[in-house]
Curated annotation (Swiss-Prot):
Record-level GO BP terms: chaperone cofactor-dependent protein refolding
Name by which UniProt lists this protein: Co-chaperonin GroES
Entry keywords, A to Z: Chaperone, Cytoplasm
Family membership: Belongs to the GroES chaperonin family.
Subcellular location: Cytoplasm
Subunit structure: Heptamer of 7 subunits arranged in a ring. Interacts with the chaperonin GroEL.
């Protein structure tokens, strides 16, 4: 993938969701919701502050994150791969 997000943007790939419960029941409809966990594929250089300095992002390529899947999330297909472009503000946590 040859893409570089700008400023505080992050490109992520959503993790697959389990389609079976722990008991082996196949989940469908609202029970099989989209995952809000993703792998970070690329990050911008950072947020530009009012004084003109650049604040580096807290996330890095390879991190697994939990994100807010709402307004401001941009779905794209790059090199045949479904990815999301989000602001770092939409990342709620880094899974360690």
């Amino acid at each position: 993938m040859n893409i570089r997000p700008l400023h505080d943007r992050v490109i992520i790939k959503r993790e697959e969701v389990e389609t079976r419960s722990a008991g082996g029941i196949v989940l469908t409809g609202s029970a099989a919701t989209k995952s809000t966990r993703a792998k970070v594929l690329a990050v911008g250089k950072g947020r530009i502050l009012e004084n003109g300095t650049v604040q580096p992002l807290d996330v890095k390529v390879g991190d697994t994150v939990i994100f807010n899947d709402g307004y401001g999330v941009k779905n794209e297909k790059i090199d045949g791969e479904e990815v999301l472009i989000i602001s770092e503000n939409d990342i709620l946590a880094i899974v360690e």
